[in-house]
Amino acid sequence: MEGQGCCGGGGGKTEMIPTEEALRIVFGVSKRLPPVIVSLYEALGKVLAEDIRAPDPLPPYPASVKDGYAVVASDGPGEYPVITESRAGNDGLGVTVTPGTVAYVTTGGPIPDGADAVVQVEDTKVIGDVSTESKRVKILIQTKKGTDIRRVGCDIEKDATVLTTGERIGASEIGLLATAGVTMVKVYPMPIVAILSTGDELVEPTAGTLGRGQIRDSNRAMLVAAVMQQQCKVVDLGIVRDDRKELEKVLDEAVSSGVDIILTSGGVSMGDRDFVKPLLEEKGKVYFSKVLMKPGKPLTFAEIRAKPTESMLGKTVLAFGLPGNPVSCLVCFNIFVVPTIRQLAGWTSPHPLRVRLRLQEPIKSDPIRPEFHRAIIKWKDNDGSGTPGFVAESTGHQMSSRLLSMRSANALLELPATGNVLSAGSSVSAIIVSDISAFSIDKKASLSEPGSIRKEKKYDEVPGPEYKVAILTVSDTVSAGAGPDRSGPRAVSVVDSSSEKLGGAKVVATAVVPDEVERIKDILQKWSDVDEMDLILTLGGTGFTPRDVTPEATKKVIERETPGLLFVMMQESLKITPFAMLSRSAAGIRGSTLIINMPGNPNAVAECMEALLPALKHALKQIKGDKREKHPKHIPHAEATLPTDTWDQSYKSAYETGEKKEEAGCSCTH
């Protein structure tokens, strides 16, 4: 029997399959649950199963942007009588503002008929006693038609799609549903998960004194909590003894009760009383029972077909026989069960979030099995390379029965099976399994202590790069570990070697994601909005194959397109190969971040960067707000004297000959 907290059994002829293959099998079997209708507040955290359209425009009436006075714009400045007040609801209903009259309006209030502009209160002056019934106001400025009025439907047009199938519902989505008047929502339900532990040695956590050979059941409590964190309904099946008939009865009852997933803990190794796998083979189909991973090798995945009843058609129940060792159990839950829950719940991208980080200390890898090493990761101003980034600290001794190694762990480091020591500062991939600690609190002091002497310059005192660059490799092959990333390192090399030409640019983040729109979109948004990168280069996924979706993901993120950059890259690439015309790259700006899709070919990356270099530095400056023109014959703005003939005169002046040139003014804003 493989008990909790005990070393599991080994042996057997079943071959271990790689983690990636095991996940592929699980995803192939796991099918999205049929949608259900729930109330508005029950929809929180679930995935939308229908498009939501706005039944009404928003705003449904012309509304004031500010507190002020609704006027006829052509009236201009002057004194006017205030004929009504429009605050909310039916205020001002039936009253028409005619030339020579005004109406008081509050922010969000409806604009009375006849008015075509609003003058804010700051640009008006009340005449006489404001308490009198006949009020007059002086309009101090000339306004234009439409000023400070939100037209009908300016936020949301009638029948516009406000939410689409596949979106996960958060607080803002609840607000949009309420805006659209939706009180019942079609969503994909969270799966119902049944949990049981097996083993004669197990007792409830409430047991006061342990008998000889007994241990408290930690796995079941841990799994119940983990499943509840995923917002699933839990069915607690308790502890089942090492008795085949008792275990079979509990499994049959669970399957017939309508659960979607069964999690067992223990009983999946090679002991003579490990009955979980034989029963799963008897009642369904076992897809695998050993995975090439550490910890978690004795993991069983099966599919059970429930018998149809009068109240329920036969359904498929997924079963995971998790290892009995606590750490192995929780690691397998995070690697396999969490993505399965998300898949059943309708997530478009159920895969766990991965990040690149640097090791804070040396770690020896296993020579045979890829390891999911428990670690605590945090963001630091200096990750050891002189730039900000995530760093990882091991939780200590990684024995699979030692639950303390999971304490405070928020990530699983993905260590390759080389048997080598990964030195401190090595870059590795990590799977996020819980909240990441915020930015480090140990900030650099801005002032030195009196009398202190700076003897040497340390890494964390080096000023940051002028422009932060992130490189995203988009590839199913590289993401799955089935091939090396050749484009990413080449792009890093090209950027770093061109740092001076780019105004001090430096690559501070890299990542690899599969060809999936949501995964690409999520990291582009994070790098733009959270990490505030100046330049993001994506590599690959720009061709014609069905999995080439990088442009689609990028277009969902960018706010302003930059077609000129794509034109230049296309021209350069066509000099090399006619197949360059098959590129569907996108480029654009999000906030203060420039995002450019590049080909996945390493040589093409270098060619495209070379083509963009003459203008890229200036582009990055402009995005940051620098409006100075860089035409080689253009007189600098600081030297311009005349305020007119902005470009033409300035340009001609630059070409004039003779001892004295006519000074040309410039007011360029491009």
From Swiss-Prot:
Inhibited by copper and tungsten. Its EC number is 2.10.1.1, 2.7.7.75. It is an enzyme of class 2 (transferase). In the N-terminal section; belongs to the MoaB/Mog family. Changing S573A: Loss of molybdopterin binding. Loss of activity. Pathway: Cofactor biosynthesis; molybdopterin biosynthesis. It comes from Arabidopsis thaliana. It catalyses: adenylyl-molybdopterin + molybdate = Mo-molybdopterin + AMP + H(+); molybdopterin + ATP + H(+) = adenylyl-molybdopterin + diphosphate. InterPro entries: MoaB/Mog-like_dom_sf, MoaB/Mog_dom, MoCF_biosynth_CS, MoeA-like, MoeA_C_domain_IV, MoeA_C_domain_IV_sf, MoeA_linker/N, MoeA_linker/N_sf. Substrate binds at T542, G543, S573, G600, E607. Changing N597L: Loss of molybdopterin binding. Loss of activity. SUPFAM superfamilies: MoeA C-terminal domain-like, MoeA N-terminal region -like, Molybdenum cofactor biosynthesis proteins. SMART domains: MoCF_biosynth. Residues 19-439 are annotated as: MPT Mo-transferase. Transmembrane segments: none annotated. GO terms for molecular function: ATP binding; molybdenum ion binding; molybdopterin adenylyltransferase activity; molybdopterin molybdotransferase activity; nitrate reductase activity. One of its GO terms (biological process) is Mo-molybdopterin cofactor biosynthetic process. Residues 466-620 are annotated as: MPT adenylyltransferase. This is Molybdopterin biosynthesis protein CNX1. Catalyzes two steps in the biosynthesis of the molybdenum cofactor. In the first step, molybdopterin is adenylated. Subsequently, molybdate is inserted into adenylated molybdopterin and AMP is released. Residues 624-643 are annotated as: Disordered. It comes from the Eukaryota. NCBIfam families: Glp_gephyrin, molyb_syn. Changing T542 to D/N: Loss of molybdopterin binding. Loss of activity. The G domain: homotrimer or homohexamer. The E domain: homodimer. AMP binds at D485, R486, G541, G600. Changing D515 to H/N: Almost normal molybdopterin binding. Loss adenylation activity.
